[in-house]
Amino acid sequence: SGNFVQRGEPAIVEKFARAETALVQGVDLVLELPVVYSIQDAGGFATGSIWTLDHVGVTDVVFGSETDDIDLMKAVSEVLIKEPEHYHDLLKKHLKTGHSFPNARKYALRDFIHTENSTFSHRIEEIGSSNNILGVEYLRAIQEIKSKMIPHSMRRVGASYTDEEHRGEFSSATAIRRLIQNGNIESASQAIPKESFDIILREIRSGRGPVFKEDVESFFISFYRLLSRDDYNRYYGFVEGLDARFQECSLSGSLEEFLHCVKSKRFTLSRIRRLMYYPVFRFTDNLIRKSNEFGPQYIRVLGFNEKGRNHLSNIKHSMKIPIITTASLWRKVVDGALKKEMEIDVDLLEAQLERDFAAVRFYASLFRYPESRSKCSDLLSRVIYDEEDS
């Protein structure tokens, strides 16, 4: 993800700094998932991710989950792809009881597997966690785009993703963010490799971080008070009365109050957190539908070492979409792609890329110091090159 992540929050530090933390730990190549995918639900996030990896010739994809049973995940993904009539009926039944779509789907899958697949019926409850759901969506996306990529599941150890307790070197991402937010830098450093933590510390000292969901509170409260119901209807996801709920709750005194005002049995907090950004970044139905159908229209490189750079050099002549390493030259890159008759939709490319640029501008407005917020643009950023690992 770039500067805004799938849980519907700003990242703790900006995308190039996070790319640098990965490179110093031995990663060869860091690519950005466009923001039109990074703050979608698990299905949209996985679709954009798999398209991106497939375009650059990745042969194997590894993801963390609470189960390492890839066969169980494949069985569930097959149901989601084929949508058998029995499963579809179960899904409608659970939706009619008022469950949110993620929960209705989870219960429908549980009921379907219990009756149709005795091999996995005793383990279907494992699929309910967010990481397992995302893993299933990766498998679904691999099949839907007909990728030859081989999936591998790596079992998570230590704290669960949302565990807020500090547990030393195996603390969750949630716990680490909470420690940093509370100023407990020393404890946070125990859970992050020193080279990576030094980069995070550099960003904090410069005023370019840490950024938390609370930092967008005043903006969102003001922004949503200015919108009418017609405004909401221009954007993706505002269905089943959500436009009315957002408008009614816009008079809330805090972001937390707003979220719980909008929340219902059908609309989960995670969905609402993501949805909050859609009017800000102008996520229309057409943009999201086309993005999910045709995939990212470019590859955005955030960082590489010599090995990663060589890989890009080796594949550039067989690429179906352009590779953007210097954002300020994106028009030149697109012109070159058109001359090579690459398979791109220029209007969709511009729409996706402009949202990435907007995300950087918005994120920079959350920095602590005015000098850090000033003149911060994706067009001024340079790809990170890790020479030490070359």
Listing of model-derived features with the role each one plays in the protein:
Residues S1-R18:
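N-terminal catalytic cores of NTP/NDP-binding nucleotidyl/phosphoryl-transfer enzymes
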Residues F16-R18, A22, D68, I176:
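Short, charge-rich amphipathic segments
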Residues E20, V24-P34:
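A glycine-rich helix N-cap at a beta->alpha junction
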Residues L33-S390:
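Active-site cores that bind ATP or allylic diphosphates and position pyrophosphate for catalysis
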Residues N3, A19-T21, D60, D345:
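Functionally constrained cores in energy, signaling, and assembly domains
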Residues I12-F16, V24, I39-T47:
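Generic alpha-helical scaffold signal
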